[in-house]
Each structure stands twice: as structure tokens, then as C-alpha cells.
Amino acid sequence: MSVGFIGAGQLAFALAKGFTAAGVVAAHKIMASSPDMDLATVSALRKMGVNLTHHNKETVQHSDVLFLAVKPHIIPFILDEIAANIEARHIVVSCAAGVTISSIEKKLTAFQPAPKVIRCMTNTPVVVREGATVYATGTHAQVEDGRLLEQLMSSVGFCTEVEEDLIDAVTGLSGSGPAYAFTALDALADGGVKMGLPRRLAVRLGAQALLGAAKMLLDSEQHPGQLKDNVCSPGGATIHALHVLESGGFRSLLIKAVEASCTRTRELQSMADQEKVSPAAIKKTILDKVKLDSPPGTSLAPSGHSKLLPRSMAPAGKQD
């Protein structure tokens, strides 16, 4: 089985690293395409031994499972480019927030009468094999196609099948969830520093507290509220701290954050349906422009049946 990523950003890197660490896919069986070979994630993928190319169609050609790992509003343009190259063997997996199965199938059926499409929502902790993934299968995807994706994604964390109409809510909860956790951890560490702890120790203690709390919950059958109550002794420090959180609307803010992420996901779908995209994003999707912008000496060299960018040619990436 070969795996391809259209897009070589944070998600592609996280999944590729997770798959190779789990041993479910070898690095040389993975290909990623990107118009920008200066990305830090491209450099990291190269060091892992992943095949890289400027050409999305080449990634399609050399993949059995094809992940669309680009921004939602880019998806229609990518599909227009690769639709003619999709074959019956391909499993097309969209990781784009808000992009529906039907919108992808509509683009692909112009060339492939029964495209196998799966929509999934995952998160960046797949990089350490602690991701949270849900997926929904399309009209023509078979049971075994869903099982294959579940096998892949279960190797990098929790994975389960859901109805497609639940995926937007999942995006707001676990898709965006790591960002909520990192923000909370940053604030906890700031509190520790304010009270005299060294920054490094404060971050480590805060991270361990969140990790331990999550593991306690997953390993038990208790409600999180009960586990919270177990920490609070009468008149103690923790219940006083929780009073401050409740006074500040802590719970309400988290609920609103999930709702806001979910709502924005649906707005992104509307943008994708209308095929609206910024000029800067269009520039990134036009391969002819990429070729014109490529510096001398970065022509693609053959490797087997594919033309891959030599590892030595691309400079170390910078943060996107």
C-alpha cells in the first residue's frame, strides 16, 4: 500500500511521521506534493525519507490512499486538477474542515463514475500517535475501504466511524481541541511563573497534569465531573481555584469555542462550494507559476518511475 499527500504542511507531516513510527507504512511508500519546497515541514518530510514532488498528479499516480491535506477553499481547485487522474483503485481521503463528501464526489464523477471518497477529521497529536480521528464513507466507498483507513488512523491514535453530519462538531471539539489545550497549558505555566516557578518546570508540570488527567479519565468509567470533585477537598485550595474559573465563565468559554470552530467549519464549506479563494492561495495552486518561480537548478530528477526532488537540492525550510 502506498500513501500520498496533496499538501505537505503540518497535517501531512504529522500523519507521515505517525504512520512510519507505527510501522504501518514505510517512508519510501509515501509521497507528498507541494508547490513550496522551502516549508519547514517539507524539510522534515525529506529527512524522514518521504518522496517529494511539485506535481499533484504525480502524487496521485503513485498513491493508493490519497489524502487531500490542504485548506478547505483550495480543495475545488485541487480536484479540478487531479480528477482525470483518479482511478477505481484510489481511496480519496479529505482532511479538509467542512468539505462534504458530495462536493468531492461531484467533482470526481466527471471522470471516474464511482470514486471512493472518505471524509475524515483528525488532529495534530497523530504525530505522537495520540490523535483523535473520525471518518465517514462516501457513496461508492466499500466497507473494506473504511476499514483500511481505520487501520491506518488507529495506528496513530483513536479512530471511529461516524455519520457525516457529526464531523463539523468533531472539528470544533477534537479537531481544534489541541489548540485549546496548548492555550490552557500556556496560561497554567504563566500562573506557575507568576508564583515563582522556573518557566521550563512550570510547562513540564502543567503538561504532565493535563496528560495525567486525560489518562485517568480514559482509564476509568467515571464522569469527568466526578474526577474533578475527587480533587476538591472541603475548603481547600482547588475548590477556591475552581470558583475563580467558574466566575470567569471558564465552562461557557470552552463551549463557545467549540461552537465557534464548528460554525466556521460550515462557513469554509460555503466558501469551497462557491470556489472562492484568495489570490495568494491561487498562486500556490498553479503549478506553472511554481515552475516559473523555481530557482535555477531545482529541476526534478528521476527516481524509479517518478521524478522526485533530490534531497540535496532543497534548502532547510522555514516556518509557514
From Swiss-Prot:
Residues annotated for NADPH binding in this entry: 8, 10-11, 34, 36, 56, 70-71, 97, 230
Enzyme Commission code: 1.5.1.2
Positions bound to NADP(+): 6-11, 34, 56, 69-72, 95-97
Gene: PYCR1
InterPro entries: 6-PGluconate_DH-like_C_sf, NAD(P)-bd_dom_sf, P5C_Rdtase_cat_N, P5CR-like_CS, P5CR_dimer, Pyrroline-COOH_reductase
Main location: mitochondrion
Location in or out of the cell: Mitochondrion
Known catalytic reactions: L-proline + NADP(+) = (S)-1-pyrroline-5-carboxylate + NADPH + 2 H(+); L-proline + NAD(+) = (S)-1-pyrroline-5-carboxylate + NADH + 2 H(+)
Modified residues (N-acetylserine): 2
Superkingdom, natural source: Eukaryota
Descriptive protein name: Pyrroline-5-carboxylate reductase 1, mitochondrial
GO cellular component: mitochondrion
UniProt keyword annotations, A-Z: Acetylation, Amino-acid biosynthesis, Mitochondrion, NADP, Oxidoreductase, Phosphoprotein, Proline biosynthesis, Stress response
Source organism (scientific name): Bos taurus
Family the entry assigns: Belongs to the pyrroline-5-carboxylate reductase family.
Molecular functions per Gene Ontology: identical protein binding; pyrroline-5-carboxylate reductase activity
Pfam families listed in its UniProt record: F420_oxidored, P5CR_dimer
Sites bearing Phosphoserine, chain numbering: 278
Region (Disordered): 292-320
Subunit structure: Homodecamer; composed of 5 homodimers. Interacts with LTO1.
GO biological-process terms attached to the record: cellular response to oxidative stress; L-proline biosynthetic process; negative regulation of oxidative stress-induced neuron intrinsic apoptotic signaling pathway; proline biosynthetic process; regulation of mitochondrial membrane potential
Pathway: Amino-acid biosynthesis; L-proline biosynthesis; L-proline from L-glutamate 5-semialdehyde: step 1/1
Binding-site residues for L-proline, renumbered to this chain: 164, 237-238
Known role: Oxidoreductase that catalyzes the last step in proline biosynthesis, which corresponds to the reduction of pyrroline-5-carboxylate to L-proline using NAD(P)H. At physiologic concentrations, has higher specific activity in the presence of NADH. Involved in the cellular response to oxidative stress.
